A protein has these predicted regions:
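N-terminal auxiliary segments of SAM/dcSAM-dependent transferases
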Residues: 1-41
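Hydrophobic (often cysteine-bearing) scaffold residues that line and stabilize catalytic clefts
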Residues: 7, 62, 91
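Conserved alpha-helix/loop element of class I SAM-dependent methyltransferases that forms part
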Residues: 12, 16, 46-50, 56, ...
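Cytosolic histidine kinase catalytic core of two-component systems
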Residues: 23-24, 64, 110
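Residue-level signal for inorganic ion chemistry
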Residues: 29, 69, 160
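Glycine-rich loop at the start of a catalytic domain that most often binds anionic cofactors/ligands
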Residues: 41-42, 53
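Conserved nucleotide-cofactor-binding alpha/beta core module
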Residues: 74-161
Length: 161
């Protein structure tokens, strides 16, 4: 499979059509190899408009959703960002491309380890993945310039607001 062509098509046909037009975000999406963040069994689907199972009952966001989240934060490069739900680390990597620092919390230890490995393999050095429950745990580094919920929650964690 030609992942470079698939990545280009994803940006042009999925991301731009969702009004994600910020050049730095588009550039990050164009350069970040999403297939590294997807389980091997699903790599052929890495650039499709679908959620991808990560195991442990968790799903990787569809590319356009991850892109829209990163876009709507309007990060300028000086922010410290908290991400709740790191998953495989793809959204973490996108956020790291546009911020000073990302602290990502992941409740599943195996996924936290996977995210750390994926970030390291991608050369992302200013993002940290911790095993923690974002619904209850608050990193000492707060307050944060932006907080992203990378998964669904029954209600927003009040301690973060």
């Amino acid at each position: 499979m030609n992942f470079e062509q698939a990545r280009f098509n994803m940006v042009e046909q999925q991301i731009r059509t969702w009004n994600v037009l910020d050049t730095p975000i588009l550039q990050a999406l164009s350069c970040l190899p999403r297939e590294r963040f997807v389980p091997v069994a699903y790599q052929s689907l890495a650039y499709t408009d679908t959620e991808i199972p990560l195991g442990h009952g968790q799903l990787m966001l569809a590319p356009k959703v991850a892109a829209r989240l990163a876009h709507d934060l309007e990060l300028q490069g000086s922010e410290t960002v908290l991400e709740i739900g790191a998953g495989s680390g793809y959204l973490t990597a996108l956020l790291a491309q546009r911020s000073k620092r990302v602290i990502a919390l992941e409740i599943v230890p195996e996924l936290a380890a996977l995210a750390r490995a994926n970030l390291a393999q991608s050369g992302i050095t200013h993002a940290e993945v911790r095993v923690a429950d974002g619904a209850h745990d608050t990193p000492a580094e707060g307050p944060f310039d932006a907080i992203v919920l990378g998964g669904s929650v029954a209600e927003a964690p009040q301690h973060l607001l």
